[in-house]
Regions:
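Conserved beta-strand hairpin/beta-sheet module of binuclear metal-dependent hydrolase folds
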Residues: 1-58
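Solvent-exposed loop/turn segments at secondary-structure junctions
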Residues: 35-38, 67-71, 106-109
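Flexible, acidic/histidine-containing loops and adjacent segments that form or flank the divalent-metal
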Residues: 1-3, 81-151
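Active-site metal-binding motif and surrounding structural segment of the metallo-beta-lactamase
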Residues: 26-27, 41-100
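A short acidic (Asp/Glu
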Residues: 17-18, 71-77, 111-115
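Generic hydrophobic/packing signal
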Residues: 9-15, 44, 61, 81, ...
Length: 151
């Protein structure tokens, strides 16, 4: 199995593509989407390049490490585009997100730290929840980690 980590230009944020699998059948995981503007400037063109002439590219997983704008904004832009395409009835969607992981540990255990919360970040997280197209499985990072270790 081959692993390649590709860092896209994301200014002060993070936007990574993890390619894994066998040559000719590699799969892709998107980790964070960078700040505003990165989706149109870096992420979308790269996804289109990977898609090539195929009608759709599968993103095995989209991971939002945390809700700071420099990590989540590009993901919000991606899912907004998918939602718009879906609402127009255009099929297939250009990208198929199989699973969306969002780190929501504090929410799961009922704890919040208002001092650590950024208003813009909270708005981005709410926007992500509001625009996720139908058919995308959402799991929290904690749930996935616990399931993986057999808890």
């Amino acid at each position: 199995m081959i692993f390649t980590l590709e860092a896209l230009q994301a200014d002060q944020g993070d936007c990574l593509l993890l390619h894994y699998g066998q040559p000719g059948g590699a799969r892709v995981i998107l980790i964070d989407g960078g700040p505003g503007g990165i989706y149109n400037r870096s992420l979308k063109p790269r996804l289109e390049e990977l898609r090539g002439r195929q009608s759709q590219i599968a993103l095995e997983m989209v991971i939002v490490s945390h809700i700071d704008d420099d990590h989540i904004h590009g993901i919000v832009d991606l899912v907004k585009q998918l939602k718009t395409v879906q609402e127009k009835g255009q099929t297939p969607l250009p990208y198929r997100i199989r699973t969306l992981w969002h780190n929501s540990f504090d929410k799961l255990i009922g704890r919040s730290n208002p001092a650590a919360r950024n208003e813009g970040s909270g708005a981005s997280a709410a926007a992500l929840d509001a625009v996720v197209p139908a058919g995308i499985e959402r799991e929290s990072t904690l749930h996935v980690v616990l399931r993986c270790v057999g808890c």
